[in-house]
Amino acid sequence: MSQSTLLFQIEPASRAQDQFIQQKIDLKTKPPGALGLLEPLALQIARIQGPKQLEIVNPTMLVFAGDHGIAAEGVSIAPSEVTRQMVQNFAHGGAAINVFCRQLGFNLEVIDCGILTPVEGVEGIIDQRLGAGTGAIHLEPAMSLACVDKGFAMAQALIERHHQAGCNLVAFGEMGIGNTSSAAAIMAAIMQLDVADCVGRGTGISSETLERKQMLIELALLLHQSAMTGPKQVLACLGGFEIVQMTGAMLAAAERKMLVVVDGFIATAAALVAVTINAHVRDYLIFAHRSEEQGHQRMLEHLKAKPLLSLGLRLGEGTGAALALPLIQAAVNFYNQMASFSDAGIEAVV
């Protein structure tokens, strides 16, 4: 194990109070299981925070942005320049994620992990650049192992800052033209699947472009097969700067026992890497939604995840993760505030 992964000392969420927590949930004034996915969600949060009183404090949305060398091959409906333009849009408050964060009470931070050209003279963008776009993965490694280590360290410092500010829930979004190619390649490498089972249309590419995207990812996997000896090596060969930093931030947030809300396909690929590095991370992950991207359901099944929402989203940015916050808060509130049968003087139906 490398020094960078040794920095993450992640404990599993405690299951010592499971019987007490489950009984508390079951004795609320409702039939057992009647609140559906909110009930195991409350159990998960109580394992992390303790069984007495649950809370969400300073929920924070982190949107990680980076460009991808493979995008020059036309694997997306948009050119790489759109990454920078969208980062500017985030900074100016005009994107879907800005709207949802304002509506739902999220603090929003945008992190430039390595877009092609930095946005200068605009407040609200955190500079954590690892380069000006990754290498084209079908021709060369995306980045060096040292770059992965640096990205993890940056992400750990970012999470520590928010933890010190009292944040106990962090949600993950991303922006990067071409990053569905990187995420699909990571999925295929780690889960040992055929590329066809992992690659999808992203934001809506044609069938011809889809075939080219699949071919390029197959070339990338063949090129780097011998070098991908572990999850960090997979990131170095196939990852994006934003995927690396999301992975590191998920590891760091789990280390600090924070709730980690995972968005769609790309964020789930980062979660897949994080869980492969340290299986205890899984205890802290809340999967917000099932996206329209081909392969996302396979990853969710691999991670034994039942997402809270299925809205047909395929935007990214953390939009699905943002929309899940009211459901997470609902799980907290019913656990804290709902009467038990004995409190209400109602005959139990357990």
From Swiss-Prot:
EC id: 2.4.2.21
One BP annotation, GO: cobalamin biosynthetic process
Gene3D superfamilies on file: 1.10.1610.10, 3.40.50.10210
This protein's UniProt keywords: Cobalamin biosynthesis, Glycosyltransferase, Transferase
GO function terms (MF aspect): nicotinate-nucleotide-dimethylbenzimidazole phosphoribosyltransferase activity
Pathway(s) of this molecule: Nucleoside biosynthesis; alpha-ribazole biosynthesis; alpha-ribazole from 5,6-dimethylbenzimidazole: step 1/2
Disulfide bridge map: none
Record-annotated active site: 317
Function of the protein: Catalyzes the synthesis of alpha-ribazole-5'-phosphate from nicotinate mononucleotide (NAMN) and 5,6-dimethylbenzimidazole (DMB).
Recorded family membership: Belongs to the CobT family.
UniProt cross-references to NCBIfam families, sorted A to Z: cobT_DBIPRT, PRK00105.1
Protein name: Nicotinate-nucleotide--dimethylbenzimidazole phosphoribosyltransferase
